[in-house]
C-alpha cells in the first residue's frame, strides 16, 4: 500500500516511493515558478538528501557558502531542537553551484524582508523561517509539498520521498554506495544496501551486461 502524505516522520524503508524521471521533471518545472523560499526548501531537500528535520534544524551559520556545504549537526521537530540520534547523522553535505546561487539569492531576500520589519538577519537565525519569523513547521513543509505534487500531477509520494529520490538517482548514476551512505548519514553501509537493494539489483544486472560487452570488444 502507498504511504499517505502527513506531517509525521516516515521510516526509511523500501516502501518509501521515489520520483520517476518524468515525475521529477514535472515537479522541478512547477518548482521553478514558485517563490524563492519554496524553491530553496525543496531543492535543498532534493539535492542534499537531508531529512526534513535536519533542514528545519539548519541555521545560517551551518551553511558554508565558500566551501559549499551544509554542516548538519541538529534536527528539529515542531516542539524543539535536538541533537541527531547517531554520530553519523552529524556530517557535512556538499552542494552544487546552482543551489549555491539560489541560497545566496534567498539570503539577500531574507535580509531585505527582515530589514523592512526592523530586524537584522543573524547567522544564528534558522535557515527557513515562517512568515511570522518562527521556525517553519513539519506540517507547513508537508502542506507546501502536497500543493507542488498536485500541480505536478504526482501522487502517493511523501516529503521523505525527496531523500529517497536523491539516493536512488545517485546510485543509478553510478555513485559509490559508501559515499551515498555517508551523505545520507546512515549509521552503517548495510542500512543503505538494505534500503536501496532493488536499485542495486538493477545496477548488478547492468554490470553483468557491461562485462559481457567488454569481453566481446577484446
Positions of predicted regions on the chain:
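C-terminal catalytic core of tyrosine-transesterase DNA break-rejoin enzymes
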Residues: 43, 47-54, 139-140, 144-152, ...
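C-terminal catalytic core of Y-nucleophile DNA break-rejoin enzymes
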Residues: 83-105, 122-145
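Short, polar N-cap/turn motifs at the start of nucleic acid-interacting alpha helices
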Residues: 62-67, 156, 175-195
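Short helix/loop segment immediately N-terminal to the Walker
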Residues: 110-124
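Catalytic-site neighborhood detector that most strongly recognizes the C-terminal catalytic loop/helix
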Residues: 18, 76, 184-210
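Conserved tyrosine-mediated DNA breakage-rejoining catalytic core shared by Y-recombinases
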Residues: 7, 48, 57-112
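DNA/chromatin major-groove-contacting recognition/catalytic segments
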Residues: 4, 26-30, 81-84, 198-218
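Basic, Lys/Arg- and aromatic-enriched nucleic-acid-binding interface segment
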Residues: 1-58, 66, 90, 98, ...
Amino acid at each position: 500500500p502507498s504511504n499517505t502524505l502527513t506531517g509525521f516522520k516516515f521510516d526509511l524503508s523500501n516502501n518509501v516511493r521515489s520520483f520517476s524521471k518524468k515525475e521529477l521533471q514535472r515537479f522541478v518545472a512547477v518548482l521553478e515558478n514558485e517563490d524563492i523560499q519554496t524553491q530553496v526548501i525543496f531543492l535543498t531537500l532534493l539535492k542534499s538528501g537531508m531529512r526534513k528535520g535536519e533542514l528545519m534544524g539548519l541555521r545560517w551559520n551551518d551553511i558554508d557558502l565558500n566551501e559549499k556545504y551544509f554542516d548538519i549537526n541538529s534536527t528539529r521537530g515542531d516542539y524543539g531542537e535536538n541533537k541527531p540520534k547517531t554520530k553519523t547523522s552529524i556530517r557535512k553535505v556538499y552542494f552544487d553551484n546552482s543551489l549555491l546561487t539560489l541560497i545566496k539569492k534567498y539570503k539577500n531576500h531574507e535580509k531585505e524582508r527582515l530589514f523592512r520589519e526592523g530586524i537584522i538577519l543573524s547567522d544564528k537565525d534558522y535557515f527557513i523561517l515562517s512568515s511570522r519569523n518562527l521556525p517553519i513547521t513539519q506540517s507547513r513543509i508537508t502542506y507546501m509539498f502536497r500543493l507542488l505534487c498536485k500541480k505536478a500531477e504526482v501522487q502517493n509520494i511523501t516529503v521523505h520521498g525527496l531523500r529517497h529520490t536523491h539516493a536512488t538517482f545517485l546510485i543509478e548514476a553510478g555513485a559509490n554506495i559508501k559515499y551515498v551512505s555517508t551523505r545520507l548519514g546512515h549509521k552503517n553501509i548495510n542500512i543503505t544496501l538494505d534500503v536501496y537493494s532493488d536499485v542495486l539489483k538493477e545496477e548488478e544486472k547492468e554490470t553483468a551486461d557491461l562485462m559481457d560487452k567488454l569481453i566481446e570488444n577484446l
